């Protein structure tokens, strides 16, 4: 008879899937510090089981992960290091310095190559996990040396960060930049993967006691090994040698990125010569040595396979050439030239963003943060120079087209260049066009620096600056768009006149602007006329059927409409006379009030339905308080003006007549007479 199979305790169940941290440490026979380091290197994280059998306040791991750690090579090297330390102590006590020197040469070293290959089987997987790696390396590159963080680690991080930046400059793969309080956010497209990382701002970093630097350094060791692999692959993909030759003296002086590196593209001629020499040497060696018949057969088979592969590759190339479209000089296929015709000028041309600053020479002043601006400008095709750079370009040089300044007082103005604030560089990179200089000149408060990582929806709130930038981007030649910082000030005549007087960033003159405006006005009037004519035609068709019936009524209505129009004209004239001219302060106050009302409306929309009753209660109480305060103020004003609380005029009270003065002796006599009468 078959029955239910019973298991002993410890053979099956969810309890066996998990293991506590103390049990894992005992099983591996290592300290807690080494266990943490191993988990960080191997990517093993603590788990949260549904039923915590051995206590709620304990950390649990998968038992499979701990078994996986038992066969790790790093564990063997750690145990070998313990033995090495014991031998070192013995040799020091015995004063055998020769043997000690040989022992130090054979010291066991930890290598992380096999761990990186296990965790990232493909290069795309490594690129996906590069965000945290770059952020941590840039953080340690900007730190100061201390007892917890060594100088060698800081220099290695700085070198790796500069290598990655140099690759991005050469490949021109930077796309977005955003400066915030936390730091500077960058985003780049590297081999089809979007990588975003943050670099800290230049400040004196304080070592906080709450931070566990041991855990951070163990992460850093792994990320340094990963970054070397990634940089090697990226450099070789462009044709650069790795590791590149870096001038350490220039790196310590904080010289420019291009001057620090001396790496050149790999010369194909040298490689071809070396391959030819190697082939000739191998052929000579093969001629002298006796050849086995088996080896000959193998060589013949390999040559046949190679010839087949070459034929297949050639056939594929021929097919691709036949399938490729023959493109015209204007970028249009020859098959579709007839369809396009004369309207080829209206086709929008795609702008190459990587050459946004091509032909511009930027001079960065001393007060401006140089490293991030240099990185951004160079990655978009510009040229950079600054005081103390290797170029030896002075501020007076006439080749400089733009000077980035953050102080308005200490600047000698040159008429041959544009003076801009650092924000212009970041905003023009994010908007993918050169913004007008008038908003970023010296002494002017620049517009809002919007985040390029936020995607605005149609239903959500869109800032006024974003709307203005969209209008600039969507316009044909970036001339018809007008930038208004406040969308509600469009009706003000002063702002319209100022915008008309401003010169466009493309260098167009005032006459050309007037011609464009006239052209737009004529187009607008023509469209209005067409619409009005369509409406009239439709109304005439409907009115022809009803003319006979409603002839008399139409006459009366026309008379009433004329009377109403005369009254409305008189009212509008009176309103124009009565309306006072508002000052700028009053306009600003009105705009602030409108903005506050819009903000409250948006906040009300964002509140959840569950929490809306609380908001309504608070709103009612605030309104009651406001009304009570207003009534008290009104009563106080009435009392101060000499009225009652109800608003009635107070009657002044008549003064009482003073009682006649009576002496004390007379009072006593009067009292005595009263007593006698009684």
From Swiss-Prot:
Composition skew (Acidic residues), residue ranges: 505-518, 541-574
Pfam families in alphabetical order: BRCT_2, Pescadillo_N
Primary localization: nucleus
Region named Disordered: 265-289, 485-601, 626-678
Residues in coiled coil: 581-640
A GO molecular function held by the record: RNA binding
GO BP of this protein: maturation of 5.8S rRNA from tricistronic rRNA transcript (SSU-rRNA, 5.8S rRNA, LSU-rRNA); maturation of LSU-rRNA from tricistronic rRNA transcript (SSU-rRNA, 5.8S rRNA, LSU-rRNA)
Domain BRCT: from-to ranges: 352-442
GO cellular component, one term: preribosome, large subunit precursor
Keyword tRNA-binding attached: no
Keyword terms, alphabetized: Coiled coil, Nucleus, Ribosome biogenesis, rRNA processing
Listed Basic and acidic residues bias regions: 519-531, 585-601, 633-643
Biased composition (Low complexity): 269-289, 649-678
Magnesium recorded as keyword: no
Highest taxon of the lineage: Eukaryota
Location of this chain's protein in the cell: Nucleus, Nucleolus; Nucleus, Nucleoplasm
HAMAP family: Pescadillo (MF_03028)
Family label: Belongs to the pescadillo family.
Summary of the function given for this chain in its UniProt record: Required for maturation of ribosomal RNAs and formation of the large ribosomal subunit.
Name assigned to this protein: Pescadillo homolog
Organism listed in the record: Dictyostelium discoideum
